[in-house]
Curated annotation (Swiss-Prot):
Its cofactor is heme. It comes from Mycobacterium leprae (strain TN). GO terms for molecular function: metal ion binding; ubiquinol-cytochrome-c reductase activity. SUPFAM superfamilies: Transmembrane di-heme cytochromes (SSF81342). Heme 1 binds at residues 113, 215. The cytochrome bc1 complex is composed of a cytochrome b (QcrB), the Rieske iron-sulfur protein (QcrA) and a diheme cytochrome c (QcrC) subunit. Keywords: Cell membrane, Electron transport, Heme, Iron, Membrane, Metal-binding, Respiratory chain, Translocase, Transmembrane, Transmembrane helix, Transport. Heme 2 binds at residues 127, 230. GO terms for cellular component: plasma membrane. Pfam families: Cytochrom_B_N_2. It is a multi-pass membrane protein. This is Cytochrome bc1 complex cytochrome b subunit. It is found in: Cell membrane. GO terms for biological process: respiratory electron transport chain.
Length: 551
């Protein structure tokens, strides 16, 4: 009896795929989706950093959830960390110590989780800044801007709740200084709201279990839903792109999803995981065993939150002790910190609609803008970054005063003055800088690139020769070119005058034949790009509405 032949796995999968396609016909739609094109600019990877960091957060968070006990019940520590043996603490702090010292890989996963949270929030901030300065939030992508703003706000509070759960001295001070004091200061409902959150006076016995539920269930679920909606909108509305040869408001130039984009994304995800793994293994963060358990009677100097909440801490430190009285109710200074936070969040979410309202720009935009081309928006963004940086530095005014031997009162007043003066000064400087860059671009398009060659005229005058970027007239003068919204070359080496580096590895050059083939391929690609640019310019010139709208 002959043995049965083992079926080939490829044939089995092919037959199953054929059966599925004959029933549900997904092949046409799947082929169309896999043929989607994505642009390849490096700045588009910032959003992927946030996405992959969130995936790492989910995986490490699930692992930590298996061992963390969010109870605030008092226990006596008898673990392996000798300096804290016999010390009374909460179960939350005890379980965090056990994760750090007794669970296999616990400290490694804890630190990866914390670093991933910082990278997630930082990536969202930088990603939003890129979208803001390039105008990617304009119609029809206002909804994605709102989603990104909500993701940043949720990430800030998710991180705040996360590092508050271990119940160490630093996290307890943060809860007392921010959540408890601000809540108590709210008029009319402050006391009732504080009792609802803490179950009585601070610190109570129910806050950490509630933060735990928010941190591992509610907020991550909302973030996951918003990320899914964000990706769906990007997929449906197509990705924005920078202006360039062959790129218009109605197409996308880049690489297809399969195989190039998928393989690049997979490699980038592996790189993010590797970097976070190295950070978690070599860079210590939040060593709670050095801080000890939280005691309401103890307060440590030099206490600051993570960077994304430091601006709120700085605002609380430098805000004057102003109290207002309405209907026999006192509104203390900490409440105004919460009011300003809410105002900042509202301005962040509604900015696309405010810009559209004041500029009257209701057109659809798929091409991005260079920051210099929109000086008002760029100046507003620089002003906001300056405001954030001043408040962040104000959050460490005690450390600055200690290290530089400055009066703490002086650092407070420096922060107050800087919060008002520096953003306005940066706005003016940025605006003038953008105007200067615009004039520099127009000068090159009109006269050409400076060559550094000085020529003496017959009557004795000296001039510098310029290399025209386009055709010249009968007298040899360059014909001014129209600005296309892309980078303008300012040096001769940008035109290839300095030659190109030799191809090959670090030690050995490529063979002559291979080097010649690579040069020929580069030349063909440049000619193809120039041809596409000429066709695009001709189509604009022949179109009655071809002139680009100005913002």
């Amino acid at each position: 009896m002959s043995p049965k032949s083992v079926p080939d796995i490829g044939d089995v999968l092919a037959r199953q795929a054929e059966d599925i396609d004959t029933r549900y016909h997904p092949s046409a739609a799947l082929r169309r989706q896999l043929n989607k094109v994505f642009p390849t600019h490096w700045s588009f990877l910032l959003g992927e950093i946030a996405l992959y960091s969130f995936i790492v957060l989910l995986l490490t968070g699930v692992y930590l959830t298996l061992f963390f006990d969010p109870s605030m019940t008092d226990v006596t520590y008898n673990g392996v960390y000798q300096p804290l043996r016999g010390v009374e603490m909460s179960r939350a702090y005890q379980s965090t110590l056990d994760i750090s010292f007794e669970v296999r890989g616990g400290l490694f996963v804890r630190q990866i989780h914390h670093w991933a949270a910082l990278m997630f929030t930082a990536a969202i901030m930088v990603h939003l800044a890129r979208i803001f300065f390039t105008g990617a939030f304009r119609r029809p992508r206002e909804t994605n801007w709102v989603i990104g703003s909500l993701l940043l706000i949720l990430a800030m509070f998710e991180g705040y709740f996360g590092y508050s759960m271990p119940d160490d001295l630093l996290s307890g001070i943060g809860l007392r200084a921010a959540l408890s004091s601000i809540t108590l200061g709210i008029p009319v409902i402050g006391t009732w709201l504080h009792w609802a959150l803490f179950g009585g006076d601070f610190p109570g016995t129910i806050l950490i279990p509630r933060l735990y539920a928010l941190h591992i269930l509610l907020i991550p679920g909302v973030i996951l839903a918003l990320i899914g909606l964000h990706l769906a909108l990007v997929w449906f509305q197509k990705h924005t792109q920078f202006p360039g040869p062959g790129r218009t408001e109605y197409n996308v130039v880049g690489v297809r999803v399969m195989p190039v984009f998928a393989f690049k994304s997979g490699a980038f995800f592996a790189a993010i995981v590797g970097v976070l793994g190295l950070m978690g293994g070599f860079l210590q963060i939040n060593p709670i065993w050095n801080l000890g358990p939280y005691k309401p009677s103890q307060v440590s100097a030099g206490s600051q939150p993570d960077f994304y909440m430091m601006w709120t801490e700085g605002l609380a430190r430098i805000w004057p002790a102003w109290e207002f009285y309405f209907w026999h109710h006192t509104i203390p200074a900490p409440v105004w910190v919460a009011v300003i936070m809410a105002l900042v969040f509202v301005l962040l979410i509604t900015y696309p609609f405010l810009e559209k309202r004041f500029t009257g720009d209701y057109a659809h935009h798929n091409l991005l803008q260079r920051p210099r081309d929109v000086p008002v928006r760029t100046s507003i963004g620089a002003m906001a970054i300056t405001f954030y940086m001043v408040l962040t530095l104000a959050a460490m005014n005690d450390i600055i005063a200690l290290k530089f031997h400055i009066s703490l009162n002086a650092t407070t007043w420096i922060g107050r003055i800087g919060m008002v003066i520096l953003p306005l000064l940066v706005y003016f400087i940025t605006y003038r800088w953008c105007i200067g860059l615009q004039r520099s671009d127009r000068a090159v398009l009109e006269h050409g690139i400076e060559t550094g060659i000085i020529k003496r005229l017959p009557h004795g005058a000296y001039i510098e020769l310029h290399q025209p970027l386009g055709p010249v007239d009968d007298h040899g003068h360059p014909i001014p070119l129209e600005y296309q919204g892309t980078a303008v070359p300012k040096r001769m080496n940008k035109l290839g005058s300095a030659g190109s580096p030799s191809s090959g590895s670090f030690l050995f050059a490529d063979p002559v034949s291979e080097d010649a083939a690579l040069r020929e391929a580069t030349h063909v690609a440049e000619q193809r790009a120039l041809t596409a640019l000429r066709e695009h310019q001709d189509s604009i010139a022949s179109s009655p509405n071809g002139e680009r709208g100005k913002h």
